[in-house]
Amino acid sequence: MGWKASELGRDHYLVLSTQGGLRAPDGQPVALGFHTGHWEIALQAEAAAERLHKLGGLPFAAFCSDPCDGRTQGTVGMFDSLPYRNDAAQVFRRLARSLPTRKGILGVATCDKGLPAMMMALAGMGDLPSAIVPGGVSLPPEQGEDAGAVQTIGARFSHGMLSLDEATELGCKACASPGGGCQFLGTAATSQVVAEAMGMAVPHSALAPSGQPVWLDIATRSADAVVAMKQNGLALKDILTPAAFKNAMALHAAFGGSTNLLLHIPAIAYCAGIERPTVNDWSAINKAVPRIVDVLPNGPTHHPTVRVFLAGGVPEVMLHLRELNLIDTSQRSVTGRTIDQELNDWEESERRHRFREILKEQDGVDPDDVILSPERARERGLTSTVMFPSGNIAPDGAVIKSTAIDPSVVDESGVYAHEGPAKVFTSEHDAIAAIKQNEIEAGDVLVVTGCGPIGTGMEETYQLTSALKFLPFGKHVALVTDARFSGVSTGACIGHVGPEGLAGGPVGKLKTGDVISIRLDRNTLEGSVNLVGEVDDRFDAEEGAKRLAKRETRDDIAPHSALPDDTRLWAALQGVGGGTWGGCVFDVDQIVAKLQSS
């Protein structure tokens, strides 16, 4: 391997990544990757390794690639999506422990499950100097559709809105660069924001354009940071404090981040040995922190993520939150400096001025229209990010990205109120078939149950939300499910309903014809989802709870017949460790205690 005896005494550093595909030196594919997010990051890993060597270290590299949720949505491949995260985190930790001489770790990752897995892995090895290198974003196309819109081509093709040739052409043009995560603030982009916000990544590293010099520079700066951490006796556990996680949750709210981070942030906290945030913690932060970023898919203007980077990214948003006293700026990042110190430098930096000017000159966009002041955000109609409705259907709670509800179905006081008959399905496939067969009508409440961790590995039901989005009356149909959603999903979609149907939750007892009432106040962030009637009867929520308690779980819901044993095991283990609201983690102490008591 080219080892030099003279270098073996150097400090050993490990560069982990989610690299996928086989890329020739000229950039041409030898073998395709699953997605753009892992296609180019070997270049970042190489840049980091070269820097580590230049700084006197001896770099090692190891890989564990990651899947693409966009590729598996609507298929049984989605049953492995969330479980993969836990598996990959374990693999990364095993790889790190397999290099017992390691002095520090760099984790290069980009996308929906690979990046949270990497963050969990590094957090679980907090005694080491470590840093995340975000894999950046792809550039939006000059012609055609962005990566968010193009994910709806399946629904549009099935409704005769596109030919197969048109769909194929749009899909191949969706990304204007070969690498990077999707151009919208889905789970991948939100995870990058969160990594930087909690101090795991160097400042202004989230959402950088993949393949560009500034993107490679992030890898170099990250290597500098880890070596400096080693020299100064700083470890990742010194960065990942309870306040750091609160900062991450505040940035999630300010950006309008993906609801999947409600699964990932608690999991990272668990791995770091920090108390996991509760629904009440999330709710309190979203009530206090305004959304001030105008980005896909939330709008209203729908800027791609690279514009958010050019407008200043995480540091620029932090400047606004510091003014509002909504973040703890005494916290440190992997640079060893406090957020206060970094923001003071950022505010006057040439880097900030240069990138904001690039956005003005090249795109003709005012940076202050991408990352807005709280006052301008209110004027533009930006609303808080998520809320957590509860009720007799969701006694343990549920979640909705309330800022993504179509404004035309929200009244002047900011309230979405919907009451309608339930159409109940036990799989996403059956629900989509009903839409294709025109069995869903305006005013319906679409219920998809049996799709939580036990049923399907808690699949994403994006194909369903995208199908509704392109129905003329789709905004007048609500969705309630114990599954989860893609970070690009929009609409009146209530997910993560708990307890899940297969765990005896009320959502698994609903019947077609039941009357469901949904009320969501986007100003107070208070919401409810209740059974309030049967076919020819109406009653209040309290009576609805009594009736649901008397019902048996539907006899037609069961774990999907194609659910892999790997995922069945994951579902059982995460259920012992706190389930969905606990981040779907493997709490080993609880699992062992459960086994020993049985």
Residue ranges and their predicted role:
Residues 42-46, 89, 223:
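Short, hydrophobic/amphipathic alpha-helical packing segments
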Residues 33-44, 467:
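Glycine-rich anion/phosphate-binding loops
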Residues 87-94, 117, 247, 430-434:
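Well-ordered alpha-helical segments embedded in enzymatic catalytic cores
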Residues 48, 92, 118, 265:
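Aromatic/hydrophobic pocket-lining residues that form π-stacking "cages" and hydrophobic walls in ligand
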Residues 62-99:
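N-terminal small/polar loop signature for handling phosphorylated ligands or for N-terminal nucleophile
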Residues 39-61:
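Low-complexity, highly charged intrinsically disordered N-terminal segments
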Residues 15-16, 23-25, 96-118, 130-134:
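A short, small-residue-rich loop immediately preceding and capping a beta-strand
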Residues 1-21, 26-33, 63, 70, ...:
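Catalytic or ion-coupling anion/metal-binding cores of large enzyme and transporter domains
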